[in-house]
A protein has these predicted regions:
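Alpha-helical transmembrane segments of multi-pass small-molecule/ion transporters
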Residues: 1-318
Length: 318
């Protein structure tokens, strides 16, 4: 319940601030740049340093285990995106009518913000490494979102300035992994620097959720609800994608800690980042907003079912 309350509180804050014109429409772009190009990279870099360099956990810092976790995270998102793209094609969507936004919003789960409190509730032992495994796994998710995801939402690499790949979260992933695997991370991850990265990184999620709340306020008067894509988005994100991810967890020859994370990821609703990217790169944020809202609400019912199924068929969670 807490994860839903927190998310909706931020949505409501953004909605109210837009309603009162505290955050005006022309403020969105600079706030988005701060969130995407400053705060989010700090969050990613801090997570890599904390769990792969400073944790003292030999498993998390080993190259072979971290590559397994990163590959699993990337494969998850590629499966989800491919499933959503196929559904969008069956709906006869095209670029300009929601193909890109549907593919990314229905294909990408809320792989960090939504998952952290679930892991904290399920695995309470002080030395349990599952949360650390999540953050290493999420490096793979970040790689896919900020490369393939950005290419999809922009309508192809030809529509992008290549500089977009050499800043922000993707750069944080590349630099973070290079430092972690080379052994140089211990020299960089000093307490004052780490604290600064942590504090700036902690702004990323609230800023994104508040911006989404602003978008909800903009769209609530003139939003045209589209039942067919919404229902298909629900079935894709909370039906087809979870089934594919549980099959992946079952057959993938990876450590049980990674399988745990995959099971939880399978049950999660759509992420906010694709909606923000749709706004930034000329997608169809109305559709993304509708899929995000409906999958988040519906996951109240579906999330426990998928967790129970994964716990029974793949590896125990409880």
């Amino acid at each position: 319940g807490d994860v839903y309350k927190r998310q909706y509180l931020f949505f409501a804050t953004g909605f109210y601030l837009r309603h009162k014109q505290v955050i005006q429409a022309d403020h969105d772009a600079p706030i988005m740049r701060i969130a995407m190009d400053v705060a989010y990279p700090c969050l990613v870099f801090h997570s890599i340093m904390k769990y792969m360099v400073l944790s003292g956990n030999e498993t998390l810092s080993s190259v072979s285990f971290s590559l397994q976790a990163i590959a699993a995270g990337a494969l998850e998102l590629l499966l989800g995106i491919a499933a959503a793209w196929l559904v969008a094609k069956m709906l006869r969507m095209r670029i300009g009518t929601g193909l890109r936004t549907f593919t990314l919003t229905a294909g990408v789960q809320n792989y960090a913000f939504f998952v952290i409190p679930i892991i904290q509730m399920l695995f309470t032992a002080g030395n349990d490494p599952t949360l650390g495994v999540l953050f290493v796994h999420n490096v793979g998710c970040e790689l896919v979102v900020w490369s393939i995801g950005v290419i999809i939402i922009a309508g192809g690499p030809g529509n992008l300035n290549m500089g977009v790949f050499f800043r922000g979260p993707l750069l944080a992933v590349i630099v973070g992994l290079a430092l972690a695997w080379s052994g140089l991370g211990t020299y960089v991850a000093q307490p004052p620097l780490m604290k600064a990265f942590e504090m700036i990184g902690n702004c990323a999620t609230p800023l994104c959720l508040i911006l989404f709340g602003c978008s909800m306020r903009d769209l609530c008067h003139n939003m045209k609800w589209e039942p067919k894509p919404i229902i298909c988005g629900l079935l894709t994100r909370l039906g087809l994608a979870p089934a594919l991810l549980l099959l992946m967890a079952y057959f993938l020859p990876v450590d049980d800690y990674i399988k745990r994370v995959i099971i939880i990821q399978a049950a999660i609703p759509s992420a906010v980042i694709p909606v923000i990217l749709a706004k930034r790169f000329g997608g169809y944020p109305d559709l993304g907003t509708q899929i995000l809202l409906t999958t988040t609400v519906a996951s109240f019912l579906t999330l426990p079912c998928w967790l129970a199924l994964g716990s029974t068929l793949v590896v125990p969670l409880y």
